[in-house]
């Protein structure tokens, strides 16, 4: 039986983009789509899509080999590739390649597919799938109590705005945004959202303790990085509005906010000069990277 395989890898936000692409591929190609999760066998990342009610099956080693043509001798694979019959897609990060969704001989897809146009046609389904369920009650008592404490603060705010500041592995390679981006975004937001209440999310507690945004804020910085992807995304999408970082993690939190009048602000420059990852109705604010680098500076 014919089928296609999409690789799942990276952190939670990346996995969500890959799954959204896979579901869209299934719809457009009218072909069964399987997920290759073998990257987590050697990566320090975890398969987190199981937090959601996903319904695409996992590919077996044999199915992955067939999709990659690895069941054929290497010389045969190379010959087919030279003849234009390669069945493995080129790596896609930010580029929008609509032809990938059309019927083709491609059977294995790898990349990040970070453009909402890949799944615009099934947006309601994707949002329904990625609406996180209530926190699990067992083995997370302390974290659940902290979550509900923070959630009560957000829900009590009349005009809640989350601000995500991505540092972590971005620091030192020139990918973290200068804080002037958040300040300009807050100036824009303050003119449109009266009496806004800010909730700052960051994985760097020391950084937020010395942070000056020009506006008062509640520090929601997590103290448990292992649980950050689950609990903090729940909290961010509970806000009315959002200021995201150049991070797929806060991108999805903003995308899943249910407020029909939400204002979402994102950096004009994402990574490597790409801009199309932001939804068309979101506001783009000029930004620069804090550490200058020819490779990473936009």
Residue ranges and their predicted role:
Residues 272-298:
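Leloir-type glycosyltransferase catalytic cores
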Residues 31-42:
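A short beta-strand-loop structural module common to alpha/beta enzyme folds
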Residues 18-25:
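Short amphipathic alpha-helix
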Residues 1-5:
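Extreme N-terminal starter segment of soluble prokaryotic enzymes
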Residues 12, 190-277, 282:
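Donor-binding and catalytic core of enzymes assembling or modifying cell-surface/extracellular glycoconjugates
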Residues 7-17, 174:
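A short, glycine/small-residue-rich beta-strand->loop->alpha-helix junction that serves as a flexible
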């Amino acid at each position: 039986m014919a089928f296609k395989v999409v690789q799942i890898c990276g952190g939670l936000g990346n996995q969500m983009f890959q799954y959204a692409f896979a579901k869209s591929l299934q719809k457009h190609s009218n072909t069964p789509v399987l997920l290759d999760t073998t990257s987590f066998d050697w990566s320090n990342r975890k398969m987190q899509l199981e937090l959601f009610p996903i319904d695409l099956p996992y590919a077996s080693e044999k199915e992955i080999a067939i999709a990659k043509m690895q069941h054929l001798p290497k010389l045969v694979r190379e010959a087919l590739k030279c003849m234009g019959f390669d069945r493995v897609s080129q790596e896609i990060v930010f580029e929008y390649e609509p032809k990938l969704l059309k019927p083709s001989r491609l059977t294995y897809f790898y990349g990040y597919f970070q453009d909402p146009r890949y799944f615009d046609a099934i947006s309601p389904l994707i949002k329904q799938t990625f609406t996180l369920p209530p926190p699990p009650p067992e083995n997370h008592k302390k974290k659940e109590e902290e979550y509900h404490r923070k959630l009560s603060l957000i829900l009590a705010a009349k005009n809640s705005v989350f601000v995500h500041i991505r540092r972590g592995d971005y620091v030192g390679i020139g990918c973290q945004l200068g804080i002037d981006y958040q300040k300009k975004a807050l100036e824009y937001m303050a003119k449109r959202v009266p009496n806004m209440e800010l909730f700052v999310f960051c994985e760097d507690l020391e950084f937020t303790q010395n942070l000056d945004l020009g506006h008062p804020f509640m520090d929601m910085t997590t103290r448990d990085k292992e649980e950050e992807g689950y609990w903090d995304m729940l909290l961010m999408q509970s806000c009315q509005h959002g200021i995201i970082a150049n991070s797929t993690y806060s991108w999805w939190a903003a995308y899943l906010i249910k407020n029909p009048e939400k204002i979402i602000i994102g950096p004009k420059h994402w990574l490597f000069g790409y801009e199309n990852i932001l939804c068309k109705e979101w506001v783009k604010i000029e930004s620069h990277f804090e550490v200058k680098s020819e490779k990473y500076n936009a």
